[in-house]
């Protein structure tokens, strides 16, 4: 229970903001996590999924550093962050093209992760590695000024990479000619907790909305006293039930559609059924469909696929670099109903792990068969968790009936 308490904190700083004695509960919880990691006492189940997602964002599947196409160097570089690209890749691409067209001196592109997951997890070694990689990519571009779309990235840079000159996208984006919101539109504005002490960012967002003619309903808890969406501090990984309650309660502060300018805030709200838009949905209408406030939260597998596809498309369309297909199990088509898909999402089981299990089982005949249903059961252990998938071959692909994972190791039990 002590572990769960320490790992359930969103590290958002609201406790300190309202405390008459200025007690920083978030610092205490993060220091406790650092101590647990250093002593080998942090349970892998608490943060492993988020840390592996960070690894993915720093891998060749997503990471990229380029000056603006056709230029040897650029005065600025756009860093959209990992979650905007995972949630809304079309909007990320559109805003980058806008920056290239309107910013003097050229705007390069840097894809990757700021290291926030390892920071929140208390994994200092992993954080240092992420920052070394990010710093190396940034320095390879000539140390340009960073235009960041994510307030968490900005906060991370300010506190841990002070040599980086960074500014919010919302402070530099030219809105002229962008957006056609309906007349009289009023939205409830959700400030991300990482913008709590960034008044210049919050003000820039409100000025953009005023320029678009969008009226803002200020939530009872906003600005310096805004609440976390449940994703911060990896709360949703360590204590998903609490995270759902936090974001559900946040969504009940107003009956209006919400507007967020953090991708994870928007997706967290959408995940509990709260109609929510991202600011880029207003600035680049049509990219999220006819009802952007009703856009569902992309699942974990889709988030990775979106990042990889965005990287490939940008390399092809802007730099003329066509990447060869990465060998793997992408050709294995998975078929499942909505209830199974929801179960996999809740259990944080990725499609790529199911494909890997099925590919190995089909190639080696290394699977079990249920005597009554004929369903096959196969496993895959890429890291510390073993993934099991119950499936059956079909004419159009492999039908997934169920999947689960565990962290047990059966001594002498072979690969299964």
Walk through the language-model features, giving the residues of each.
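Iron-sulfur-cluster electron-transfer modules
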Residues: 1-161, 298-315
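Active-site rim beta-loop-alpha module in soluble metabolic enzymes
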Residues: 228-232
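Iron-sulfur (Fe-S) cluster-binding modules
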Residues: 1, 12, 28-31, 37-41, ...
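Hydrophobic alpha-helical positions that pack around
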Residues: 189
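Nucleotide-sugar donor phosphate/pyrophosphate-binding loop at the beta->alpha transition
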Residues: 126-131, 240-246
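Active-site glycine- and acidic-residue-rich loops that bind
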Residues: 84-91, 95, 194-208
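Ribonuclease/tRNase effector modules and their secretory precursors
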Residues: 292-416
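Acyltransferase/transacylase module recognition
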Residues: 233-241
